[in-house]
């Protein structure tokens, strides 16, 4: 039960981040899928043309980091959805609904909870105070160098963990869907990722994410429509027929079958809720619009698209119970689903649309990976070039050309690192990295951004000590927990008994920031508190905020 519980949680631990959890363990390679490969080549061709087009329009630092602030709220909402909806969500949640029914809906709603937090607490102030990265906001009235160093470290750790999970997941997913070799798949994803970001910057990344979101929503909508058509558009029929054919019977309509440990569940819930508001590649998207109003619209549209997508995955999961489960064509000799339960949605695509639509859905799953890794790579590169190189090493005196050069070098380095780690971690269950990435985002990035915008008494000392404590607590508790301490390191019992650290590491971060700020009586601390009023005015009004013209 414990292993199953972990595998389910890890499967879903991140929508935006990881096909890895959707495809953990051994992969059964499928036959070469010609339709899928043709459609994927068409997608790559189209996106490479977009990259060429974007490269002609990417001239300045602002163009490269934020597409010059010229993306509209609607476009950005679609791009955020494209950045957030992963193959893990599409395959993983529909697979969870296929195996466990109603519990799948609970998990998918969990992913949505973080967006109202971003809408009401983060989006407008972030856009008014920042320019290229969230470190601009965190360091607005505090000491630039230490805060930017901490923010960049938090960003890079999250990006690195996500990238490893993405690359391993990408290799396994492509091996599973296309029949391609794992190493070939990882290298292919790495090369395409570098090309998008290196030449097209944020503009190319945005349009890759928009196209991917449209394709994924269109494909999932068609699948859900065909499922509903098969039951005459009657939900009662869908559910009652599913109950009849599912091995678990009526229990698939009840919640609570997956979570045996409430502390781990609460910790995961907190990480999902608040970690979303600390993901660097998501936060960076708010600087691509012209003002706070468009930033707010972005979240509104993104929430709508993401919510709609999770409703579709629920219908797709029940459709798979009905149309895939009883069909022997999709089973092996032992009666198990071909390719594993994570293939439920892919088999449903075959059942409702034939081999052509199966090829389309397989290609969309690959496109999903490319869109997510491109956003991650750009976020990592900007943390190095803008926060570490320009602001810390050069103390704000770097010229634009050098900063862009550093950013592009970082993109290439990240590409090599991602490919290398993807190959290195091929046989590992890398699901714990995803939980750790979200926990770090919730324990380090989110507290600093949130408190810097809302609490007048915050000082550099408090932010630094509390932020580092949150980050280190999350990492240490994860190492001492059951996944690493027992499963990987081979000890008999875990020192920290729960799966996720966010419940405790967030408390450590917030208490640390509060305590070390209120006990800071230095002159610098007093000055930082006095600068809050000017920050508050700008965060509310946008007066003095960087406009697209200044990018």
UniProtKB/Swiss-Prot annotation:
Membrane topology type: Multi-pass membrane protein
GO biological process, one term: sodium ion transport
Subcellular location: Cell inner membrane
Domain of life from the UniProt record: Bacteria
Gene3D superfamilies per the UniProt record, alphabetical: Sodium/glucose cotransporter (1.20.1730.10)
Assigned keywords, A-Z: Cell inner membrane, Cell membrane, Ion transport, Membrane, Sodium, Sodium transport, Symport, Transmembrane, Transmembrane helix, Transport
GO cellular component, one term: plasma membrane
Pfam family, one: SSF
Sequence intervals crossing the membrane: 34-54, 77-97, 104-124, 150-170, 184-204, 207-227, 263-283, 304-324, 356-376, 406-426, 430-450, 469-489, 498-518
InterPro entries reported for this sequence: Cation/Ac_symporter_ActP, Na/Glc_symporter_sf, Na/solute_symporter, Na/solute_symporter_CS, Sodium:Solute_Symporter
A single MF term (Gene Ontology): acetate transmembrane transporter activity
Function: Transports acetate.
Entry-linked PANTHER family: CATION_ACETATE SYMPORTER ACTP, SODIUM/PROLINE SYMPORTER-RELATED
Family, similarity comment: Belongs to the sodium:solute symporter (SSF) (TC 2.A.21) family.
HAMAP family noted in UniProt: Acet_symport_ActP
Protein name: Cation/acetate symporter ActP
Organism: Yersinia enterocolitica serotype O:8 / biotype 1B (strain NCTC 13174 / 8081)
């Amino acid at each position: 039960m414990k292993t199953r519980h972990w595998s389910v949680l890890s499967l879903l631990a991140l929508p935006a981040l990881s096909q890895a959890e959707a495809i953990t363990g051994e992969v059964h390679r499928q036959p070469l899928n010609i339709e899928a490969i043709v459609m994927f080549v068409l997608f790559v061709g189209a996106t490479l043309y977009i990259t060429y087009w974007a490269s002609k329009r990417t001239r300045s630092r602002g163009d490269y980091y934020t597409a010059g602030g010229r993306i509209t709220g609607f476009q950005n909402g679609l791009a955020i959805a494209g950045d957030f909806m992963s193959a893990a969500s599409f395959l993983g949640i529909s697979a969870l609904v296929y195996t466990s029914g109603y519990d799948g809906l609970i998990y998918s709603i969990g992913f949505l909870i973080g967006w109202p937090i971003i809408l009401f607490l983060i989006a407008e102030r972030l856009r008014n105070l920042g320019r290229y990265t969230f470190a601009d906001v965190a360091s607005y009235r505090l000491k630039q160098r230490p805060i930017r160093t901490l923010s960049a470290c938090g960003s890079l750790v999250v990006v690195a963990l996500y990238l490893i999970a993405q690359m391993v997941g990408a290799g396994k997913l492509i091996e599973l869907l296309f029949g391609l070799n794992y190493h070939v798949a990882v290298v292919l994803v790495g090369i395409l990722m570098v090309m998008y970001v290196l030449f097209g910057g944020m503009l190319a990344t945005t349009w890759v994410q928009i196209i991917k979101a449209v394709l994924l929503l269109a494909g999932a909508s068609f699948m859900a429509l065909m499922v509903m058509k098969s039951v005459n558009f009657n939900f009662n029929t869908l559910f009652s027929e599913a109950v009849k054919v599912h091995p678990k019977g009526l229990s698939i309509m009840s919640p609570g079958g997956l979570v045996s440990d409430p502390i781990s569940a609460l910790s995961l819930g907190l990480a999902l809720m608040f970690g979303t508001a600390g993901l660097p590649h998501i936060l960076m998207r708010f600087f691509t619009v012209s003002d706070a109003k468009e930033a707010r619209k972005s979240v509104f549209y993104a929430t709508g698209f993401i919510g709609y997508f999770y409703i579709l995955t629920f219908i797709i999961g029940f459709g798979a119970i009905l149309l895939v489960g009883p069909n022997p064509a999709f089973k092996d000799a032992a009666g198990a689903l071909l390719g594993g339960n994570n293939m439920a949605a892919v088999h449903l695509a075959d059942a409702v649309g034939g081999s052509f639509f199966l090829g389309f859905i397989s290609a969309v799953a690959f496109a999903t990976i490319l869109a997510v890794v491109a956003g991650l790579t750009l976020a990592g590169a900007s943390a190095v070039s803008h926060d570490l190189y320009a602001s810390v090493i050069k103390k704000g005196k770097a010229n634009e050309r050098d900063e862009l050069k550093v950013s592009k070098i970082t993109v290439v380095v990240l590409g090599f690192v991602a490919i290398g780690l993807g190959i290195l971690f091929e046989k590992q269950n890398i699901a714990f990295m995803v939980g750790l990435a979200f926990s770090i985002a919730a324990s380090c990035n989110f507290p600093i951004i949130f408190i810097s915008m809302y609490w007048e008494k915050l000082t550099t000392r408090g932010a630094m000590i509390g932020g580092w404590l949150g980050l280190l607590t999350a990492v240490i508790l994860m190492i001492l927990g059951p996944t690493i301490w027992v499963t990987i390191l081979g000890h008999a019992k875990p020192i920290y008994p729960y799966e996720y650290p966010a419940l405790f590491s967030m408390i450590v971060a917030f208490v640390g920031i509060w305590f070390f700020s209120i006990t800071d009586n230095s002159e610098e601390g007093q000055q930082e508190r006095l600068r809050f009023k000017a920050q508050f005015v700008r965060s509310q009004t946008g007066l003095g905020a960087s406009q697209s013209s200044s990018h």
